[in-house]
């Protein structure tokens, strides 16, 4: 798994964080200063990259959290096999199967020989854009 670490206080909207083992995109960060002897707390709301589920993280701002390293690649669609797509990476020429995206905007553009951008996050792949 390719991850790095940062503190909760450094998270911004649009950044990525691992919550419950799932890579998520941060959509909201609120910070609350507690009493005289307590430390500041942060409430992070994020949406799972693969599941689309809403997740929350409540933690002190100085707590370490995992941040996934996102590898962006370009590939070419070789075959459409129902709910999966066979893709060839245009840099390494490796072929692999990847799940077809559920978004109608992406699914309508999928056809053989089309180029696509996919992300590899924590050993899993996701189609982000079809050219």
UniProtKB/Swiss-Prot annotation:
Protein family membership: Belongs to the eIF-5A family.
Gene3D superfamilies for this protein: 2.30.30.30, Nucleic acid-binding proteins (2.40.50.140)
Compartment(s) of residence: Cytoplasm
GO biological process: positive regulation of translational elongation; positive regulation of translational termination; translational elongation
Keywords: Cytoplasm, Hypusine, Initiation factor, Protein biosynthesis
Pfam families reported for this sequence: eIF-5a, IF5A-like_N
GO molecular function: ribosome binding; RNA binding; translation elongation factor activity; translation initiation factor activity
Function: Functions by promoting the formation of the first peptide bond.
GO CC term, one of those recorded: cytoplasm
Gene source species: Saccharolobus solfataricus (strain ATCC 35092 / DSM 1617 / JCM 11322 / P2)
Name of the protein in question: Translation initiation factor 5A
Gene name for this UniProt entry: eif5a
Positions where Hypusine occurs in the chain: 36
